[in-house]
């Protein structure tokens, strides 16, 4: 999976897909009341990027629904995964549950259209810190209460704050989540990061009987040397400001026979058995 990073304006969707991404990440900013308002990162962000691009969240969902719906004029077959980078740290912890309810309802109304949409992308909920786990509980409660629990099959969970992996596992156990879990490891492209935690996540992913990590990806990679390093370690995905660079690296002799771009036929919740 090549995840285009910080794709917060509607016009950026095609831009990143044209560069080779088959997944996009966008930031969800909340009001103080826990209502998801806009796709927006804000300052600071990655080096060399404009941090202020944004869209109304519901309008963004309406557009991305078309982009991921077969036979729609806007359909782009390659886009198979949407990573919602949630920003609940900008609201009080007491509002995390309200935020989870709101995002679930907005996806139901504007993306899935309560069963009337054929939009097919998988959804990855990126949660910054384990302390925000009530967001996940609320999201799942809302799907169940609204009568659309089946959409859980399309939704995965990912904690992005580089916290202790055992601590993350403990929270997933509390929530009763034993599958459909991704694990991110990374840092803004402005800084270098070692591989110790990334290697630990990959080791856990590959441990028989360990149910709390199905996929591992590294972020935010802009240098080809770091992309190569991550691929050699065996990551499932790369988040980048430059998907075209990832494409070029994947075509290199060392990687061409080992990796390929994921398609809709590849289940993002299953471990790859090479």
UniProtKB/Swiss-Prot annotation:
Binds 1 Mg(2+) ion per subunit. Disulfide bonds join 45-51, 47-190. GO terms for molecular function: lyase activity; metal ion binding; phosphoric diester hydrolase activity; toxin activity. Its EC number is 4.6.1.-. It catalyses: an N-(acyl)-sphingosylphosphocholine = an N-(acyl)-sphingosyl-1,3-cyclic phosphate + choline; an N-(acyl)-sphingosylphosphoethanolamine = an N-(acyl)-sphingosyl-1,3-cyclic phosphate + ethanolamine; a 1-acyl-sn-glycero-3-phosphocholine = a 1-acyl-sn-glycero-2,3-cyclic phosphate + choline; a 1-acyl-sn-glycero-3-phosphoethanolamine = a 1-acyl-sn-glycero-2,3-cyclic phosphate + ethanolamine. InterPro entries: PLC-like_Pdiesterase_TIM-brl. GO terms for biological process: killing of cells of another organism; lipid catabolic process. It comes from the Eukaryota. Expressed by the venom gland. It is found in: Secreted. Mg(2+) binds at residues 25, 27, 85. It is an enzyme of class 4 (lyase). GO terms for cellular component: extracellular region. Dermonecrotic toxins cleave the phosphodiester linkage between the phosphate and headgroup of certain phospholipids (sphingolipid and lysolipid substrates), forming an alcohol (often choline) and a cyclic phosphate. This toxin acts on sphingomyelin (SM). It may also act on ceramide phosphoethanolamine (CPE), lysophosphatidylcholine (LPC) and lysophosphatidylethanolamine (LPE), but not on lysophosphatidylserine (LPS), and lysophosphatidylglycerol (LPG). It acts by transphosphatidylation, releasing exclusively cyclic phosphate products as second products. Belongs to the arthropod phospholipase D family. Class II subfamily. This is Dermonecrotic toxin SdSicTox-betaIIB1bvi. It comes from Sicarius cf. damarensis (strain GJB-2008).
